[in-house]
Amino acid sequence: MNILVIKSSVNEKKGSYSSHLSDLFIKFYLEIHPDDQIEVYDLNQFGLANTNLTMKNFEDKTFYQKAESDFWINKLRNADKIVFSTSMTNFNYSATTKNFFDAITVPNKTFLLDKNTGKYTGLLKNIQNVQILTAQGAPLGWYPFGNHSALIKQIFEFLGANVRSDFFVLDGTKVAPNNQKPIADFVAQRQNQIKILAENF
């Protein structure tokens, strides 16, 4: 199995809750599947992190080149499963995540549109499962309009991926007493849930 791990938090250098989740998930997964191939990418280390879609670069098509669209699409095509992590930023997923989805959501490469019927068909059917791991400062339910985890799931499904795993949200990271604990300690409180997700992935 080829497992593609994508990290997309803007807090990687300070310490990211969602990346800690991802690392713990992969640790548990490798205990069960030691021979699987794991590729880990922090999107912040690539050009797309600072390349957003604009009127100009959409019209002249330079966005897709600068964001290395084909590189990421090929990574997705060659993956059997995806582990995707990001944090909530201003009620949504990070801008880096938005850039990533703009780069990979490309007609005739990752989806087809039948203009006669209006039907969309995702082309990334090779992806057998996607584990979405997210973090947010607020407890669940504080911002019902900000369901970034569900949106990520729906985008992968639109592109043809089979998302069998439930997404996992580490919530309340910015409220007391959680915000007074080291990141690793707070994440460790949920490790039993993460282990179960890894076992079922």
Swiss-Prot record:
Binds 1 FMN per subunit. FMN binds at residues 9, 16-18. Quinone reductase that provides resistance to thiol-specific stress caused by electrophilic quinones. The keyword Disulfide bond does not apply. It is an enzyme of class 1 (oxidoreductase). It comes from the Bacteria. InterPro entries: Flavodoxin_fold (IPR003680), Flavoprotein-like_sf (IPR029039), FMN-dep_NADH:Q_OxRdtase_AzoR1 (IPR050104), NADH:quinone_OxRdtase_FMN_depd (IPR023048). Signal peptide: none annotated. The gene is azoR. Its cofactor is FMN. Belongs to the azoreductase type 1 family. It catalyses: 2 a quinone + NADH + H(+) = 2 a 1,4-benzosemiquinone + NAD(+); N,N-dimethyl-1,4-phenylenediamine + anthranilate + 2 NAD(+) = 2-(4-dimethylaminophenyl)diazenylbenzoate + 2 NADH + 2 H(+). This is FMN-dependent NADH:quinone oxidoreductase. GO terms for molecular function: electron transfer activity; FMN binding; oxidoreductase activity, acting on NAD(P)H as acceptor; oxidoreductase activity, acting on NAD(P)H, quinone or similar compound as acceptor. Its EC number is 1.6.5.-, 1.7.1.17. It holds the Pfam family Flavodoxin_2. Homodimer. Gene3D superfamilies: 3.40.50.360. NCBIfam families: PRK01355.1 (NF002370). Keywords: Flavoprotein, FMN, NAD, Oxidoreductase.
